[in-house]
Structure formats: C-alpha cells, structure tokens
Amino acid sequence: EEPLGRLSEQGLREVRGGQRFDTNNSAIGLEQRSSKDPSEAWVQGLGLGVKFGAPLDPYVRYSAARQWNFSESKWQINSLSRVTQFNQRGLQVRTNFDVNRPIDEDRTLRFQTYVDFEERRDSAVFSQTAEINRVIDSRTALRYALIVVGEDRGENTIKDYVLQAYYRRDIHKNILFMDIVPEIHFPTEGNLDPYVALTFRLEAFFRGNFSRLF
C-alpha cells in the first residue's frame, strides 16, 4: 500500500496513531500507467486492489505525476498525487511536492511537502522537510533532515519536530535494501519530553514487465 519508509520517515504514521510496522497498511493491486515522459506531460494511472485487514477493503485509485526541470538554475520540481476510494475507509488523498537542486556531484538539497487526507478521520496531516541527500557510493546513500509534522485538528497544528539521519544500503543487487534511521523527536502536545527513536528496516523489491507475458 505504502512503502514502509514513506509515512514513517515523514512522521505522519505516528500522528495518525499507527505503528511503523502494521499489516493493516498492506495491500495488493494492479495499476495501468501511461508511458509518457513525466518531464513532458502528466503521467496518469488507474488501479484496482484490495487493502488487507478485517474486513478486506477493495479500492479504486487514480494517480498523476509530473516533473519540471529548470536547466539554468538546476532546480527540479516533482509532483505526485493520488486519490483512492476505499469501500470501507472512504476517500483518501495524498499529495507530495519535491523541490530539489544539486549542491555538487554527490549532494542534493531537497525540500518536500507531503499532505495526507483521510475521510474517515475528517482531517489532514502534513509534513515539511528540509534535507541534504548524499550519495556515498553506487550502493549507499545518506540523508540529514529536519522534519515538521502537523495535523489540522487537536490542540496544536504542529505536532512534532524531528531531526533525522537516514542511512540506506543496497545489500543485494538492487533487490534487497537495508535502512538505519536514528531520530530525535520534539513533540508539542501531551507534555511529552523529547525522545530518541531508532528504526532498522529491510525492504525487498520485485520488479517485472507483465506486458512481456502476453
């Protein structure tokens, strides 16, 4: 449904009250996407699937992605949005804007805005990140980030400030990846003290071109 790193690294999963590793966040589905170049036109997709849980929750999804490159300034803007209608959970809308620029051959400055609306909660959570990404070698990358997380409900709009380092390593042929993510959280509600979190994660990716099978 969502790459495990995506919501947890932005801090949104904790605001939603979920766990970093939750089987109810898994789904299986198929999506047909246009083959256009995102730097020249919108890449649109339409998909169907089922989200796991009790009960199973079928869904239909529309997605759209676009990229803008500014050659003179080297800035790049990426937009990715998707609208999902679940049978049980209702409407969900997710939007991500990524603005980035290379600093040198190995480092990139990036600003990301992420918004997630869920009809069943009648609220939207968001995060804003400022980060420096560094490519250490062909299999290893490191990111330093400041993340601000919020929600349009509750006592405070801003829920958490996060300082994060994110180490990612390709440990087997671009299929199996290892992540180590230490964080320092500064929550703004509930009189909570700052705390340290450490995430260790393995992710496996299986890719294929189904069109070759027919």
Where are these regions (language model features)?
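Outer-membrane beta-barrel initiation region
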Residues: 1-38, 49-61
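Solvent-exposed loop/turn segments connecting transmembrane beta-strands
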Residues: 19-27, 49-59, 84-93, 116-125, ...
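Membrane-embedded beta-strands of outer-membrane beta-barrel proteins
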Residues: 28-32, 62-64, 95-97, 128-130, ...
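Outer-membrane beta-barrel channels and translocator barrels
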Residues: 35-41, 69-72, 102-106, 135-139, ...
